[in-house]
A protein has these predicted regions:
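A contiguous loop/helix-start segment that scaffolds small-molecule binding in enzyme catalytic cores
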Residues: 5, 165-235
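Solvent-exposed alpha-helices and their adjacent loops that cap or buttress functional pockets
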Residues: 1-2, 24-25, 88-89, 96, ...
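Cofactor-binding loop segments of dinucleotide-utilizing enzymes, especially the Rossmann-like FAD-
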Residues: 37, 99, 154, 176, ...
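A polyampholytic, Gly/Pro-enriched intrinsically disordered region
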Residues: 79-87, 142-153, 215-226
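Class I SAM-dependent methyltransferase SAM-binding "motif I" and its flanking Rossmann-like core
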Residues: 103-167, 233
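Short gly/pro/ser/thr-enriched loop/turn and capping motifs at secondary-structure boundaries
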Residues: 39-42, 67, 129-132, 180, ...
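Class I S-adenosyl-L-methionine
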Residues: 1-15, 20-22, 27-120, 209-210, ...
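General beta-strand structural signal in soluble alpha/beta enzymes
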Residues: 34, 61, 96-98, 124-127, ...
Length: 235
């Protein structure tokens, strides 16, 4: 009997934002795969899912190198594939946890592609994205009527972000942690900084909220889990 792989989005931080289905499957799992980096111990996704994990479940941390080198990344994905397949071949139910939604800026997508043609059943359970949680948490409408919404990673080239914000009415900027000064500059240029909001680690105990990004110090230190919502004032 072959096992089954579940990709589960645990949402942005609050365990109660996990879907009923996600919580049930986590509670029934034989194996839970928790992605981690080489530099950090622990897993935010695992902590979010923890209230639903049963004693019989085995937790298996898998390292995914946070590097730009394609060969090193591929090596990490292949190792994850090997580990997951070893459990699936034993008939185990395997859960791969991911923050937010599994198909939105997630490591799970790469593992999914490697395993989808191996003959094993896969089911992906959606989760609440950080930007949707922030909009609801702060009462900040993300996009309205015929407005155009842009979703961009702050890690993209500056000129690419600039071009996108030039035509967008509203913006979601993900992964704001290393280059806040460049992002801030671009938001100011396109008249989107004054009413912008940013949350680091939304739904977690150490959540930080920033309202109005035009006057924030350029050297502000931010967590990797930081997201900006912005609107153009002249439209």
């Amino acid at each position: 009997m072959k096992g089954k792989l579940y990709g589960i989005g645990v949402g942005p931080g609050d365990s109660e934002l996990m879907t009923v289905k996600a919580a049930r499957i986590v509670g029934e799992a034989d194996i839970i795969i928790t992605p981690k980096t080489e530099k950090k111990d622990g897993s935010v996704a695992l902590n979010i899912a923890a209230p639903y994990i049963q004693e019989h479940t085995e937790i298996v941390p898998v390292v995914f190198p946070m590097v730009l080198d394609d060969a090193t990344q591929e090596e990490g994905w292949q190792e994850a594939k090997r580990i997951i397949l070893s459990y699936l071949d034993q008939g185990k139910s395997v859960v791969f946890l991911t923050l937010g939604d599994p198909m939105f800026y997630s490591t799970y997508m790469y593992v999914y592609r490697l395993i989808e043609n191996t003959g094993h059943e896969i089911e992906t359970i959606p989760g609440v994205t950080a930007f949707c949680a922030i909009g609801s948490h702060l009462g900040y409408p993300i996009v309205e009527k015929e407005e155009v919404l842009a979703i961009v990673p702050a890690t993209a080239p500056k000129e690419k972000i600039d071009a996108v914000l030039a035509v967008a009415d509203d913006a979601v900027i993900m992964k704001v942690y290393k280059n806040f000064d460049e992002v801030q500059e671009t938001l100011i240029k396109h008249n989107m900084a004054d009413d912008a909001v940013m949350i680091s680690r939304v739904g977690l105990p150490d959540e930080q909220v920033y309202v109005g990004l035009d006057n924030m110090p350029k050297d502000t230190k931010l967590n990797y889990l930081s997201t900006i919502l912005a609107k153009r004032k002249d439209r």
